[in-house]
Amino acid sequence: MLGEDWNSRRLRKALIEEYPYLQPRNVWTDKIAEDYDYEYIRGEHELPEGWFELFLQMCEDIREPLIKADYLNEFRFSQLKEKYGSMRVYTFGATSEVNDIIAKYEFLSQQICCVCGKPATTQTYGWICPYCFEHVKNSGEKLDDCAVIDIKTSYVRRIWSAGSHMETVVDCSDEWQRYLKRIGYTDD
């Protein structure tokens, strides 16, 4: 879907049919506005543009577990945003499998340019944001004032349960490779 016209109501309608949780609803009543005309979809204006393809890939990955749990039409995002240089996804309840998938994509977002969606090379200080080399130059930040990002495709998840501590390595390499393929990225 990269490069498609996001202003297309046809595209928005198709996305909502595939992922009903993208349809905006009233936060208090959970109802869809009677005059809703596919003017926007959930996440479109809430996340940096560079992360939207990653977000849609996450939506694809959570769809099957939601169907399996018979929760596809009830699942809702409560908030989507950027915070401390990563995508944050809050829900109105999800299965542990869906939460695990969301956590992977939140981790991967830290390594994706928030402007264009390419792999990030730098991260700014102050207002933390990952940028590719091209966009950090346009951000007004001095390169000397930025941290270099070493792309990682796994992270350590720490769980505390019944007074004991357990660590697990979470591998995101499949999701990362699918994302790079999705955006047509090559190292050339």
PLM segments and residue spans:
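Residue-level signal for secondary-structure boundary elements
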Residues: 66-70, 110-114, 140
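Short functional micro-motifs and their immediate structural scaffolds
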Residues: 119-122, 137-140
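Short, flexible, mixed-charge glycine/proline-rich loop motifs
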Residues: 81, 100-111, 122-126
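Long, charged N-terminal interaction/targeting segments
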Residues: 1-99, 155-188
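TerminUS-proximal long segments
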Residues: 131-139, 161-165
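Short cysteine-rich clusters marking metal-coordination/redox-active sites
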Residues: 113-116, 129-132
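Short cysteine/histidine-rich zinc-coordinating motifs and their immediately flanking basic loops
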Residues: 124-131, 141-149
